[in-house]
Regions:
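A glycine-rich, Thr/Ser-enriched phosphate-binding loop motif common to dinucleotide/cofactor-binding enzymes
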Residues: 1-9
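Conserved small/polar residues in nucleotide/adenosyl-binding loops
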Residues: 171-173
Length: 173
């Protein structure tokens, strides 16, 4: 439901038919599961958006979730011209490093420095967020932060899915 809410939010705020959406890895003190990045990537790949995934080497997502996304290991390059920035931490996926933290590089924290190279991008995160680790206060408190409307869209996404499930169950009665 979270990634569906994210899609609804992008649809509400996009200024072009094909926005550039960047999902960026960000540091976190604990290794987090890949569920949110994987489902976000699935929804983005189902759209006609320009979708870029950026992370340090070693944090690759499974190919079935990466899909047609461009993978860029240089975060600043990935952010160039972006319309939406979606920040999320995830643990390493492959090999002997599965589930581990390979980097706590604070240069990957989303800050004004990275946002300056975007197309005045909106900042997104599924919340709760580790301030000044995933994203700086300046970014999450900026007018370009849409984390609150994004969170509110969880109710809409849940309502849509529940309605559809109920409609399907009524068909079988």
């Amino acid at each position: 439901l979270q990634s569906f809410a994210d899609l609804i939010t992008i649809e509400e705020y996009k200024k072009t038919a094909r926005p550039k959406v960047v999902m960026t890895w960000a540091p976190h003190p604990r290794p987090l599961p890949q569920a949110v990045p994987n489902s976000f990537a699935e929804w983005m790949n189902a759209t006609d958006y320009e979708f870029v995934i950026t992370h340090p080497e070693g944090y690759e997502l499974a190919p079935q979730f990466v899909g047609n996304a461009k993978v860029e290991y240089d975060q600043m390059k990935a952010f160039e011209g972006a319309d939406f920035i979606y920040a999320k931490n995830w643990a390493a996926y492959s090999g002997d490093n599965y589930g581990q933290i390979l980097s706590k590089d604070r240069d990957w924290t989303v800050s004004d420095r990275q946002m300056a190279v975007t197309n005045n991008a909106y900042f997104m995160h599924c919340l709760p967020v580790r301030r000044n680790m995933i994203v700086t206060d300046d970014v999450i408190e900026s007018p370009q932060s849409i984390v609150i409307p994004e969170a509110a869209n969880r109710e809409i996404s849940a309502t849509v899915v529940l309605k559809r499930l109920l409609e399907l169950s009524l068909i079988h009665i």
